[in-house]
């Protein structure tokens, strides 16, 4: 009795191979495991004890958990979301608003002392990760550029304010930690901009090459028909 086993086709790009192995069930399990780890009081306290770790480690990990949960959604749920998220615009607008709100220093202070706000913060970041996962590809390069053109300058400006402000903006964190976070926010905004621009150029070159190849392949057929 032969047993068939689906395997990735040789030559597939690395992200195609990753998508083949990252089944919805595995993504959902990974998301729940990550959330369980982040909920451990000792780890949560360690991440939130520093301003830079709070925003640059805990925030992205919660967003990653949300992205994994979005990957575990059934097709019907994805289609339901897509109905109100045409071209990813609604999801990206909500993401920008939530990230802007969570950069307010007062929110960080309140999250450390108020469990309800802490829960709301974590839930919002998980939803942001899911929204990004469900919105990024449908958005296309134009909407992606508009989104990053708003979020990245905001991030860099907030970071520079953290660096230049001579007083603490968060009561729970030291001035040195505030300045460190500010520098990282500026560098992160610049790095994301460079990576996205490089990806945009790569995508456009590949698209033009594919179009040219299809036109060249169509020319012999057109010639044969004329003959």
Can you name each region flagged by the protein language model?
Residues 2-227:
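Alpha-helical membrane segments of multi-pass proteins
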């Amino acid at each position: 009795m032969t047993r068939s086993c689906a395997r990735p086709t040789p030559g597939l790009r690395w992200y195609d191979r990753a998508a083949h192995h990252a089944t919805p069930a595995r993504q959902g399990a990974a998301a729940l495991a990550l959330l369980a780890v982040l909920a451990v009081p000792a780890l949560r306290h360690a991440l939130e004890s520093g301003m830079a770790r709070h925003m640059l480690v805990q925030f992205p990990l919660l967003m990653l958990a949300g992205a994994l949960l979005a990957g575990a959604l059934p097709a019907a749920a994805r289609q339901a979301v897509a109905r109100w998220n045409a071209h990813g615009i609604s999801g990206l607008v909500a993401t920008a608003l939530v990230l802007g709100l969570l950069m307010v220093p007062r929110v960080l202070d309140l999250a450390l002392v108020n469990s309800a706000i802490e829960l709301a913060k974590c839930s919002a970041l998980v939803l942001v990760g899911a929204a990004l996962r469900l919105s990024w590809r449908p958005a296309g390069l134009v909407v992606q550029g508009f989104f990053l053109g708003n979020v990245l300058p905001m991030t860099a400006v907030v970071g520079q304010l953290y660096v230049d402000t001579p007083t603490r903006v968060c009561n729970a964190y030291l001035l040195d930690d505030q300045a460190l976070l500010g520098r990282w926010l500026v560098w992160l905004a610049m790095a994301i901009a460079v990576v996205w621009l490089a990806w945009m150029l790569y995508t456009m070159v590949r698209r033009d090459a594919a179009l040219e190849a299809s036109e060249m392949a169509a020319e012999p057929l057109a010639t044969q028909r004329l003959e």
